[in-house]
């Protein structure tokens, strides 16, 4: 069977694209490798921007996907200056694996789903041949269009486009934890071990500590920062339940955003659509997926799709580039210290509270 569109990846970008493109009656195949043994490493917080995007589709999050506690503020810690401030934020704390499964369940049955890992994509005449490893067998599918929704490690982007965008290694550990005395969500800065940020998040009976680290010496710096943090907060981080890691993009320039051409297109983080300041990518994944699905639904001409998709995602690129400048205030120690020292935009903790 030859498909009109093959989607690689069934996260928020891929599932949204599949759901929207299915309205066009095209022949669609979506391929994803995530399962209970191969989960996507993620902090699992749904930011307000992403919540707003789901509201446009009248999508609600079932309580089974949410975990305890729900979050209304973030405790911001600078390990060098020892300054701590609190800022109001509204995140949904959730199980990321169940969240992705729920989004896949919303895809109409008319879309074929294959659980497997894409190993190769090649152009052959007027079609793309997509090789998929499923149950230790290589199966080849053909399609007129390939959409890469496979995140930072995108095989689609690596195969067809230059992948020079800056990357971090996101590393996080899970710990068994029944002590809820510390804040439920903390954001950590430590310029000596990372040029980015780290986080502490409670999820039911677990505590997650993770961060985005420069690729060079990432494991060493993770361990150094972890030791520094545990001593500062007097927090026991020795009872490790599991450790996970994945690459994450940090866009810096317009050229880091690659939307695609000639029947091979990228959405979500695979296209570079992720916040360089907070690394929130779900809202951009949904936006880019919706834009491309609407364009392909009405057009089969590669040139028209390429031109319109590039033009209609310009607003998204500008928004993310603005966050490059926001990052300067967040990650420049001098500017951040001024903001935190004077309590700009922070909320005051009541006396006697930990």
Language model features with spans:
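FAD/FMN-dependent oxidoreductases across multiple families
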Residues: 120, 217-292, 301
């Amino acid at each position: 069977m030859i498909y009109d569109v093959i989607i690689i990846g069934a996260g928020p970008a891929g599932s949204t694209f599949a759901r929207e493109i299915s309205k066009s009656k095209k022949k669609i195949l979506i391929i994803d490798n995530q399962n209970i043994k191969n989960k996507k490493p993620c902090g699992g917080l749904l930011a307000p921007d992403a919540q707003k995007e789901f509201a446009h589709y009248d999508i609600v999050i079932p309580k089974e996907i949410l975990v305890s506690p729900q979050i209304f503020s973030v405790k911001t810690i600078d390990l060098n200056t020892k300054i701590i401030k609190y800022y109001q934020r509204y995140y949904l704390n959730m199980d990321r694996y169940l969240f992705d499964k729920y989004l896949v369940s919303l895809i109409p049955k008319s879309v074929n789903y294959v659980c497997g890992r894409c190993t190769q994509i090649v152009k052959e005449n007027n079609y793309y041949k997509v090789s998929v490893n499923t149950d230790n067998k290589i199966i080849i599918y053909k399609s007129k269009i390939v959409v890469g929704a496979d995140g930072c490690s995108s095989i689609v982007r690596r195969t067809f486009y230059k992948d020079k965008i800056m990357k971090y290694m996101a590393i996080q550990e899970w710990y068994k934890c029944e002590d809820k005395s510390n804040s439920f969500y903390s954001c950590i800065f430590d310029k000596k071990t990372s040029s980015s940020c780290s986080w502490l998040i409670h999820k039911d009976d677990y505590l997650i500590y993770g961060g985005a680290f420069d690729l060079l010496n990432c494991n060493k710096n993770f361990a150094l920062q972890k030791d520094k943090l545990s001593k500062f907060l007097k927090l026991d981080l020795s009872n490790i339940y599991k450790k996970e890691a994945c690459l994450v993009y940090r866009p810096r320039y317009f050229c880091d955003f690659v939307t695609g051409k000639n029947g091979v297109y990228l959405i979500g983080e695979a296209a570079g659509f992720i916040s360089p300041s907070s690394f929130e990518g779900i809202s951009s994944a949904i936006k880019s997926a919706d834009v491309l699905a609407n364009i392909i639904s009405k057009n089969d001409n590669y040139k028209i799709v390429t031109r319109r998709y590039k033009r209609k995602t310009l607003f998204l690129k500008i928004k993310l580039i603005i966050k490059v400048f926001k990052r300067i205030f967040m990650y420049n120690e001098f500017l951040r210290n001024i903001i935190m020292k004077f309590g700009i935009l922070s909320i005051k903790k009541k006396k006697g509270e930990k």
